[in-house]
Every structure is written in C-alpha cells, then in structure tokens.
Amino acid sequence: MKKMNIAIDGPAGAGKSTVAKQVAQALSFLYIDTGAMYRALTYAAIEHHVSPDDEASLKSLLDSIEIKLVDEQSKTRVYVNNTDVTDQVRTEEVTKTVSLVSSHGQVRKEMVRQQRLLAEGTNCVLDGRDIGTYVLPNAELKFFLTATVEERARRRYEENIQKGFKQSLEQLIKDIASRDEFDSNRSFAPLRKAEDAIEIDTTSLSISEVTQTIIGYVKERV
C-alpha cells in the first residue's frame, strides 16, 4: 500500500482522539496526537509561570523543552523532558488554557513543523483542528467530525467523572461553546472544515461506528 496520511479534524469533544487512535490501531498506522503536544506545552507554561498571552515567551519555552509522545495500545503517553505528564495534561486548568496557548502563530508554526516531520514518509493518522487545512493539506483522506454542543459536553462530563474531575454539565456546555467560538475565530489556522473533507456527524453514533465508517473510506482508496 502506498503511503497514506489521514487527517481527522473537528471541535472539542467530537471524538477525534478516540476515533483516530482506533483507526490507527486497526490499520497498523502511526497515531500522532497533535492536541497532546499543545497540552504538553500548556502544562509546561503553567509550571514555569509563563503567561498564555505571551507568545514570545511561549515560543522560547517550546524551544527549550522536549515533548515526546509514546504510542501505547490503550493511550498515548505524553512526556516533557522525559517526565511522564500524561495525566497532568488533561486537567481542567490545562483544558481551559490550551486554546489560547495554541492560538499563537509562532507556537503553531513550530508545532506544525514537528508534526509534518513525524508524518513524513509514513502511514499515519493525525487529529486536531487544522490538520486537513494547514498541517497536512495534501493528506490522502480528510474527515471532519461534528456533534451537538450538548452531546460533546455530555461525553466530556463522563470522561471527567471517570478521571475524578468535578465540573457541572452546564458549565461544560458553556466552556465547549466558548472554545468553539475561540477556535473558529482565531487569526492563525482557525478551526474549519477542509473543502475536500468528509463530514461525519457523530452525535448519535458510537465510537466503533465512526471508526468503521472511516476504515470503509480507507479501504475504498487502497
């Protein structure tokens, strides 16, 4: 099979990461969790007391740390300077701050450079908000996952309960709607569907159903 890059984009809580992971596992492709890379930088910024508004300092911090992703069957482990921060990058504080950190042009350009290097010459699945439009505009297959704000908030609420995080469903609905607006209106590489992306509404679909739908499209291309 010739090299294939699969881009999966969509708003927060649409199921991108879980689906991307399962698609990659089913096809024996590399999974690159781009969101975890931004979360790792956000975590480091909080630890180093770097303001999420300070683009220059964030870029300097990014240049000074090593972010590593280790793909395991059950999850992607995230390391900053060889320290496992997999759980720390999923806290509420990081989640609330990551959109602002990732909105800066200098930060995104460097992250995208790293992501393109990882994807070069290999079969891989990447998920994020600008994979099909900016990171890998020439990806062989592009998907855009959507779901209602209420459904996405419900999924995040259940995830948080499993992780021991407490946040009301009503607040999550507000937070996700706010993040949608921010991500869609940022000046650099905003969240939007690529013209050639296949849109899948996941509101009433299971993870398995979405995964199988994407795999079906992949098999058509092989």
From Swiss-Prot:
GO terms for cellular component: cytosol. It comes from the Bacteria. Its EC number is 2.7.4.25. It is an enzyme of class 2 (transferase). InterPro entries: Cytidylate_kin, Cytidylate_kinase_dom, P-loop_NTPase. SUPFAM superfamilies: P-loop containing nucleoside triphosphate hydrolases (SSF52540). Keywords: ATP-binding, Cytoplasm, Kinase, Nucleotide-binding, Transferase. GO terms for molecular function: ATP binding; CMP kinase activity; dCMP kinase activity. GO terms for biological process: nucleobase-containing small molecule interconversion; pyrimidine nucleotide metabolic process. Belongs to the cytidylate kinase family. Type 1 subfamily. This is Cytidylate kinase. It comes from Halalkalibacterium halodurans (strain ATCC BAA-125 / DSM 18197 / FERM 7344 / JCM 9153 / C-125) (Bacillus halodurans). The gene is cmk.
